[in-house]
Amino acid sequence: MAKHVAVLMGGWSPEREVSLRSGAGCAKALEEVGYRVTRVDVDRDVAEVLARLKPDVALNLLHGCPGEDGTIQGILEILRIPYSHSGVLASALAMDKARAKVVMAAAGIPVPGGHLVTRAEAAKGHVLPPPYVLKPNTGGSSVGVFIVKEDQPHPPQELFRADWTFGESLMAEPFIKGLELTCGVMGDRALDVIEVEAVHGFYDYESKYAAGGSRHILPARVLPQIYQQVRMLALEAHRALGCRGISRADFRYDDTLPDGKGLVCLEVNTQPGMTETSLVPDMAAHAGISFGELVTWMVEDATLDR
């Protein structure tokens, strides 16, 4: 009998639409290779829905809360449904940028400087010398991320709108010039390194998910030793945070500094996108792994107690 896979997608975070796209593509790929698939658009009754479905495996394709912060992982552990990607602790830790940076720095992984500020503090004036980056301490897909430039008298007013939904805690980091590099990890294997070039300057939400919004340059145009250093650090970050299954580490690289000193790890994404424009499927394809094989691997890798 074909394995029954519940594909978890949607949810209520600002990344809902990306999750629905990831889920739809993966569900289709699983059906094509013979799995029995139920698409679950996650709402607050998800525990009841999953208890009724009793799937063999849950493929977690949620982004943001509740799928990326340990919440859905805890529900699946209670229901004893094997699931993909990282477990409760690693998910919660990686979702909190400040705490994840502490862990990675302790493991010897270079991370950017900076500190946490509240929205109220940011509203009063510059919290770092410009240029610097302000982003929600929890969240992904570059949603709510702003670069504050030298010619701006104050941070972007979008941060202080009444309909802001990304929390009161912001991470302020110095802006690091240079290349945007990213590397996926698949189990204990680092995939290849992509250089991301945004068409309109900043690799924001629109650049990530709009057709033609960015270029994925694979392999990245860096020296071989930097390329291998990125792969090594991505795997080390995956392990330091306790990640499982698929993750993706994002880096900035200032090639004007000597001996690779310009390379820093910005963050680790435990639920990287799986849409038609996403990075991990591109990396896998470059390694000879088809999209169907990648999704099948995630299902077969699923366990409890992750």
From Swiss-Prot:
InterPro entries, per database record: ATP-grasp, ATP_grasp_subdomain_1, D-Ala_lig_Van_CS, D_ala_D_ala, Dala_Dala_lig_C, Dala_Dala_lig_N, PreATP-grasp_dom_sf
Source species taxonomy: Bacteria, Pseudomonadati, Pseudomonadota, Alphaproteobacteria, Hyphomicrobiales
Protein name as annotated: D-alanine--D-alanine ligase
Source organism of the structure: Azorhizobium caulinodans (strain ATCC 43989 / DSM 5975 / JCM 20966 / LMG 6465 / NBRC 14845 / NCIMB 13405 / ORS 571)
Reactions the enzyme catalyzes: 2 D-alanine + ATP = D-alanyl-D-alanine + ADP + phosphate + H(+)
Chief localisation class: cytoplasm
Pathway(s) served: Cell wall biogenesis; peptidoglycan biosynthesis
Required cofactor names: Mg(2+); Mn(2+)
Domain ATP-grasp: 101-300
Molecular function terms from GO: ATP binding; D-alanine-D-alanine ligase activity; metal ion binding
PROSITE patterns: ATP_GRASP, DALA_DALA_LIGASE_1, DALA_DALA_LIGASE_2
Cofactor note: Binds 2 magnesium or manganese ions per subunit.
Membrane among keywords: no
GO CC annotation, single: cytoplasm
